[in-house]
């Protein structure tokens, strides 16, 4: 569906035109709207300016557009979203030294969730599901971004995994300590 703020019904042409230029796989409930503004030309200019790019598979859930209707933000129900990372994605993240700035909140949630999966793996838990409040429940000394991603990469290599699929309901609200992202590009 289209986001509610467009105030119109879905048209058949939306299935082709309401997509990012880099969309490859089907499965999302909605398009990741922050990426809709990027054209092939804009992506090329960013690359020429020295910005490194990598692409994730995001299956945006209906909850993306769900308003918060509770007084206590912790009580807000988050929908699970499926996220997929390739071994190449992990290799890129492990080797990257600079800031990571995702396009859109779904990408941000995916990257932050990936970090927390590395934390879980380091503790012997290989279930790739990040509960809504998991990050707020862990204040112990935590691994760096690269250490967490290296744990995941080693797990993938040891188990012959080319593509890692998980689910997240991570909820980022004031007080969250970012482990991966240092900014965001969004609309």
Give the positions of each predicted feature:
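Surface-exposed, charge/polar-rich loops and edge strands
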Residues: 1-187
